[in-house]
């Protein structure tokens, strides 16, 4: 319900809503006083985050009882309780973030909660009312497994648990001991292709460790796991970051599987057996499977992109526009994890809304305003959390370089550096983002060996080596069979695109993929290791194959099923054997 309806005199039910707001103000004031009193008592003895969390927990219990019985006067149910807990979890995270922000800006621990409450309490009112009065509990239906999903999800869970166990065992002795500093250990010793273990570092000891311009909200989204890890460290005596990261990735992987399966079933109306086959096929692709265990941001992006596609597909099927609030929330989450993927949410809104996308109120509230605010937040985050550390690191490096230069003999200092094969392409121009472009890396060989090669089938030579280590930019396959499989996959994909060229869902997914291909192959962003971005676009392959399944009949369809099944078996066999051999100790 729009907020303006609360204040419209001609709106029916206005007195009831006014009374509701008054009751909320009374209950909210009492809850705030309880929380602040407990915080003020504890903050002198324990960490301010823990003190605020204890106070919030006590006020939460009071708030739930008072909100259901007095404020909104609704029946207490399990679903409403879950929705209430979810809204308060979001509000708790927001409170911690705002509290630490004002502390960093110079306010005392006594005064910082006051502006925090001023910001967070109105947000909490909107969320609580949504879950208790507007049937917002329906959102949980998205995460409720259906009977037909139990078996494939259980099998997929078993596979992922095994792979996570192998990865954790590989780094157990290095990553679980408690240390004074964690980042260096993770960066120096973790090796899994080009994936970065930044999530391990941020959960072990929170910082804005990700690139704040490309991942502006990601560090804050994993902040609760960092707090939980601090408590587990005290209880267990080990760093549990590897387990918490695995749990997060497992959740995202399972629901990515579920959302893809539902896209095939609910939106494309595929048969159950075909939907299961194509869902399994998707996760047989090398860097989709690898992203499911890599402690990086890619699987979170896949989860959010498939959620965006699923919701958009449902609205396309109903010929309804993607709501403004839904667009706003999807953009904040998706762009907050990876900024360029936020453009895909706007594409989804454009496909579902058509010309309505350009209406001033939608363009302002759902596109321009959130994009501007997120960009400004990125710049603020850089100034507050990153800039001072970067200056200190640059100064330290300059001092070390000066010391080394003084120690080197004159002739050695004047000799040219040894020649090495260049791995970073020549940028189109210098700048905050354009310095990441690449106009010199060959496009054709990158497409064959990396974009549709390594992304789908791991190379045995230089297996899972890092480009910034010993891996060349271009690695050929040893066996012609790999090129045959790659050609089959590309041909089937193109055939599916032709068959589904009028399908709105496939058109939307293709627009997502084309955006990535334009960035990688056109501008050269990340072209030298384009395979690690596979999950940002590879879902278009099973969706195109689904359109091919829908077009064929009789013997042709049976032949296609057998071919896709054989390709899936080959990909799992090829990629899992390589991955397991890499993870097992030598």
How should each PLM-predicted stretch be described?
Residues 146-194, 201-206, 368-383, 568-574:
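Transmembrane signal-anchor helices characteristic of membrane glycosylation enzymes that use polyprenol
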Residues 293-297:
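Short acidic/glycine- and proline-prone juxtamembrane loop motifs at membrane-interface regions
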Residues 142-143, 342-371, 385-399:
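Perimembrane helix-loop-helix junctions
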Residues 197-243, 413-495, 506-509:
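Lumenal/periplasmic acceptor-binding loop at the mouth of the active site in multi-pass
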Residues 322-339, 345-353, 365-370, 566-567:
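Membrane-interface alpha helices of multi-pass inner-membrane proteins
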Residues 247-268, 491-495:
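Transmembrane-helix motifs of polytopic, lipid-linked glycan transferases
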